[in-house]
Amino acid sequence: MKMIVGLGNPGQKYAGSKHNMGFMVVDGLAKRLNLTIDKLEFDAATATTRLNGEKIFLVKPQTFMNASGRAVRELMMFYQIQLDEIFVVQDDMDLTLGKLRLRKRGSAGGHNGIKDIISATGSDEFCRLKIGIQHPQRQRVVDWVLTPFSKTDQPLIDDAIEKADDALEDWLNGMPFDQLMNKFN
């Protein structure tokens, strides 16, 4: 069993915002797999399929970013998903725009959605795919993450989403995480 969790904020108000990179990536993967993420369960929108004989969950928590842990924990408990079967997709202000970074574990690094998942699960031992949204120059962080990408930045973001979905597909198809890091970091 594998679960891919895209972090973001629900609702049209936040659609396309920098903080919703996780949602955008999971939506792209769902499209590749001909899935619709529309089942509401455990404070999350989900889709399930089977790939290579394994059950796959695509998840978009509907609790707002800073409370994502509850949905992740409840899905883990109900479906008996282990931490090493989870891959969380997030935005990262400390990475240059469009850069991907994969990590096996680690601290939240200031990301409140990750912090809440660590708190809810009691562990930081889950895989992450971080996508750079760049740090704001003079703008307040909260305003920066909740605004959409500029038209000039959008092609770079579209490319990053494609690469992120390539990485997730490779993981779903059994590529070892160390190889994923070598290929996509």
Swiss-Prot record:
Keywords assigned by UniProt, alphabetized: Cytoplasm, Hydrolase, RNA-binding, tRNA-binding
Residues the entry annotates as binding tRNA: 14, 64, 66, 112
The answer on whether this UniProt entry bears the keyword tRNA-binding reads yes
Feature type site, description Stabilizes the basic form of H active site to accept a proton: 91
Query: Which GO CC annotations does the UniProt entry carry?
Result: cytoplasm
| EC number assigned by the record | 3.1.1.29
Q: Which reaction is the catalytic activity of this chain?
A: an N-acyl-L-alpha-aminoacyl-tRNA + H2O = an N-acyl-L-amino acid + a tRNA + H(+)
Task: Enumerate the CDD domains for this protein.
Answer: PTH (cd00462)
Q: What class of enzyme is it?
A: hydrolase
Q: Where in the cell is it found?
A: Cytoplasm
Keyword Plastid applies: no
Q: Which InterPro entries match?
A: Pept_tRNA_hydro, Pept_tRNA_hydro_CS, Pept_tRNA_hydro_sf
GO MF, one annotated term: tRNA binding
**Which residues are listed under the site Discriminates between blocked and unblocked aminoacyl-tRNA?**
9
Active site per database record:
19
NCBIfam families per UniProt: pth
Q: What does this protein do?
A: Hydrolyzes ribosome-free peptidyl-tRNAs (with 1 or more amino acids incorporated), which drop off the ribosome during protein synthesis, or as a result of ribosome stalling. Catalyzes the release of premature peptidyl moieties from peptidyl-tRNA molecules trapped in stalled 50S ribosomal subunits, and thus maintains levels of free tRNAs and 50S ribosomes.
Quaternary context: Monomer.
Family in the record = Belongs to the PTH family.
Q: Which PANTHER family match?
A: PEPTIDYL-TRNA HYDROLASE
Which protein are we looking at? Answer: Peptidyl-tRNA hydrolase
Q: Which gene encodes it?
A: pth
